């Protein structure tokens, strides 16, 4: 799989209080922005140059206005192709997800506690470094599950961290991990190799266009750490085409929990367990038969 032909990006710089970073990331992710850096007094968001136009700017302004009641001033700057990996690595430190999980940069040495599961990530600009609360919530939920014999699908895999974690938690069946972003899919392939985990199939797929046919392969657990808008569209598809599968999801803000409960009720899922961190939640749900 090849990364996009151009790596030129637009950098959006928001001068906001750091307490608002998580909320802004949630809002901006709903208009298709996936890559962020947290700098001193600024949240930096990146999107491919080809995606930046008047309609995208208008969508951002509308989302910010609806969420915050006003549109904060932000700048948009062209960023030529650069070593994004170096940019990312300069900001990354090891992340202790729990007593059991540690996420580190690839090819770096860290002190590891006895019994700790280590996941080495070379993140490029893919989602899933452990720095975002939704990734941490998903991993903490996964720790509590018996994954050994489940056939697992990871939708929007990003760095591949959840699929890798499933294998390191003892899963013995084939795992399908996919993303609709070529750069992310390539990154996940690299991280699977870096962690020396076998039988994880990484694909470049569109969750909304190709999900139904892919689900026909038969899955027991669907991992979906993606944004609310995508969840709204794909959960009914999962319910129809994987009628017995559990779904572990995140990417939903706490204030959107009423929406999630209504959706789950409508498509006949029951909530097994929900956990929270900051403004985010993760829910494990299963079919109500």
Curated annotation (Swiss-Prot):
Q: What is its EC number?
A: 2.1.1.-
A GO CC annotation given for this chain? cytoplasm
Q: Of which family is this protein a member?
A: Belongs to the methyltransferase superfamily. PrmA family.
Q: Where is this protein found?
A: Cytoplasm
Q: Where does S-adenosyl-L-methionine bind?
A: 135, 156, 179, 225
Classify the main location.
cytoplasm
Which UniProt keyword terms apply here? Cytoplasm, Methyltransferase, S-adenosyl-L-methionine, Transferase
Q: Superkingdom of the source?
A: Bacteria
Q: Name one GO biological process term.
A: methylation
Lineage of origin: Bacteria, Pseudomonadati, Chlorobiota, Chlorobiia, Chlorobiales
Pfam family, any one: PrmA
Give the catalysed reaction(s), semicolon-separated: L-lysyl-[protein] + 3 S-adenosyl-L-methionine = N(6),N(6),N(6)-trimethyl-L-lysyl-[protein] + 3 S-adenosyl-L-homocysteine + 3 H(+)
Q: What class of enzyme is it?
A: transferase
InterPro entries (alphabetical): Ribosomal_L11_MeTrfase_PrmA (IPR050078), Ribosomal_PrmA_MeTrfase (IPR004498), SAM-dependent_MTases_sf (IPR029063)
Gene Ontology MF, one: protein-lysine N-methyltransferase activity
Q: What is this protein called?
A: Ribosomal protein L11 methyltransferase
Known function: Methylates ribosomal protein L11.
């Amino acid at each position: 799989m090849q990364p996009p032909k151009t790596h030129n990006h637009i950098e959006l710089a928001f001068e906001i209080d750091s307490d608002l970073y998580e909320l802004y990331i949630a809002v901006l992710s709903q208009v298709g922005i996936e890559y962020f850096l947290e700098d001193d007094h600024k949240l930096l968001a990146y999107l491919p140059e080809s995606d930046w136009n008047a309609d995208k700017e208008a969508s951002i302004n509308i989302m910010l206005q609806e969420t915050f009641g006003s549109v904060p001033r932000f700048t948009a700057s062209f960023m030529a192709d650069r070593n994004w990996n170096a940019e990312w690595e300069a900001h990354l430190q090891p992340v202790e997800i729990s007593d059991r999980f540690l996420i580190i940069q690839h090819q770096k040495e860290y002190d590891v506690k006895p019994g700790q599961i280590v996941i080495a990530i070379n993140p490029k600009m893919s989602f899933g470094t452990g720095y975002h609360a939704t990734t941490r919530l998903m991993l903490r939920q996964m720790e509590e599950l018996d994954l050994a014999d489940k056939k697992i699908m990871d939708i929007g895999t990003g760095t591949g961290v959840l699929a890798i974690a499933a294998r390191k938690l003892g899963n013995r069946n084939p795992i399908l991990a996919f993303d609709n972003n070529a750069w992310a899919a390539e990154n996940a392939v690299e991280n699977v190799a870096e962690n020396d985990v076998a039988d994880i199939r990484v694909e470049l797929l569109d969750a909304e266009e190709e999900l139904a046919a892919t689900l026909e392969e038969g899955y027991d657990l669907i991992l979906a750490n993606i944004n609310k808008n995508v969840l709204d569209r794909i959960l009914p598809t999962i319910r129809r085409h994987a009628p017995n599968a559990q779904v572990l999801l995140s990417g939903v803000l706490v204030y959107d929990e009423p929406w999630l409960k209504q959706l789950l009720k409508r498509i006949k899922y029951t909530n097994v367990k929900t956990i929270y961190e900051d403004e985010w939640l993760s829910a494990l749900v299963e079919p109500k038969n």
